[in-house]
């Protein structure tokens, strides 16, 4: 399990989306990024589909994931 509390691009609000991690300032779950990428979408398509999310946030989430996996 990744420690999302160390990623500045995301937040967890207990009363929002059952406490799921979301992109900061949005209601878009972080998991939506990975589900869309797994389904064949590109980052550009994801950003088009979820305009409240910025490229910087996506880059930060992907960087955090990569760092977390290489540290494990």
Where do the model's predicted regions map?
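Acidic, low-complexity/disordered tracts enriched in E/D and polar residues
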Residues: 1-29, 34, 67-72
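Long, charge-rich, low-complexity alpha-helical segments
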Residues: 26-72
